[in-house]
Amino acid sequence: MTKLATTGLSLIRLLGYLTVTAAALPLQALSLACGWRGVSRQLPRLYHRLVCRVLGLRVAVYGRVSTARPTLFVSNHASYIDIEVLGALITGSFVAKSEVKSWPVFGLLAQLQRTVFVERRMRSSTAQQRDSLAGRLQDGDSLILFPEGTSNDGNRLRPFKSALFSAAEIRIDGHALAVQPVTVAYVRLNGTPIGRHMRPYFAWYGDMALADHLWNLAGLGVTEIMVEFHEPVTVEALGSRKRLAEHCENVIADALARANSGRGIEAPVVDAAAVAA
């Protein structure tokens, strides 16, 4: 990657990020300890919105967020920034691989947002994954799932793992669970389209060092991110969780390809400044 980040901006933004995080951590811990369910559900969304502002992330939203509660949101995954963006738009908890729980700072943040940690490497854990997710969904909590199982380079999707859709087979109060595909795409930096050569500034994958990546990202200007909420579906309508996974993968892949090619989105903008820098 060529050097685009500025040291001064990186320093200011990361200090802002640390300040917001230091303020939010004890408040969220207190709300969980005291059983303030409404606060513990809404505070993470406020936190993520503030982080987006601090880091210069401007989000344009297309489509409408599912109003069914709970909803299982499924999204492509290119970066830890996806969590800030989706967390700012959706009241819910994330589903993450178990290793995240032990990460410094980010592991604590994930636990305080009541993230559901799953072991994705063991085939025998499918039933346990379903039970863990089903329990939270039955309790009324919407969940945000990255069915690729890991982050990618932001240019294309990895195959979706149908086993991760097992929780979609449960019924909530006698009704099929709503599953909403969501596409996240990093489209412009300071008004300039983000091409393949610039996407590594935003996508975090493989063996990239987290600290270096975050420092560089914080030093960039205003990043425009497109989030498209597609039409919710159910496993019953599609016949099986495998077909559900294929449907979500195809819908998200098509939208990501359009966004990355600069062809834009056909749906009208619902909130072009849902998270403004």
Q: Positions of the model-derived regions?
A:
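N-terminal membrane-anchoring alpha-helices
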Residues: 1-60, 259, 273-277
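Catalytic core of membrane glycerolipid acyltransferases/transacylases, capturing the structured
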Residues: 24-39, 45, 52-54, 69-123, ...
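Membrane-proximal, non-transmembrane interface segments of integral membrane proteins
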Residues: 70-71, 129-132
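A cross-family acyltransferase "interaction/gating" segment
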Residues: 106-107, 154-239, 262, 266
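Cytosolic-facing loops and C-terminal tails of multi-pass membrane proteins
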Residues: 242, 247-277
